[in-house]
Amino acid sequence: MRNLMLGVFAVFMAIPAQDRPQPTCNRCSASYIPNDELQAYLKRVPAETGVSDQQVRAVDSGKTNVAIGIVYRGKLSGGSPNVAEHDFISEVYHVIDGSATIVTGPDIVDWKRRPATNENVRLLNGPGGDGVSIRNGVTHHLKAGDVLIIPAGVGHQFTQIDDHIRYLMVRVDPDKVVPLKDEEASKADLRKAPGLR
């Protein structure tokens, strides 16, 4: 009788556990990035290029990695020299200030694979390619407060930046192709001269 009661008790204890799904990131901790750190990255724009795309954090969130980058792009007229495309990483842009025109679409003209040794491939976006233009692309006029979601495999090309654009970038990396970067690594990057990794 005692064994029967223990068995019934075990069944009743297991029922609530079945109702609650298991999180994909069991016992993970949250990641906090203070505004001061983001601003420090924005101040590191290389004068010679006028473009700065810097990974602030890349964290394991269970089934996917999520990275936060901060990007500055200076004035551009006449279009970017290339289209960018990332095979596995989707990007979300949240415009902080400035404005720009960007064209997006999957049909990339003269697509060529980026070398695996490329710093952006290794540290920011994972494997992907470049092209000269986007056939039948969609034009977006970005301004402060706007959000643009660019799924993996979709080409994107800035065609006009009147003065500048600054945006926070969220990179979604379900295949975990880009290395993780914690707060300590971020602070170490900030101690280095801009452009050095």
Regions inferred by a protein language model and the residue ranges of each:
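Conserved metal-binding segment of the jelly-roll/cupin
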Residues: 140-162
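A short hydrophobic beta-strand segment most commonly corresponding to one strand
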Residues: 163-179
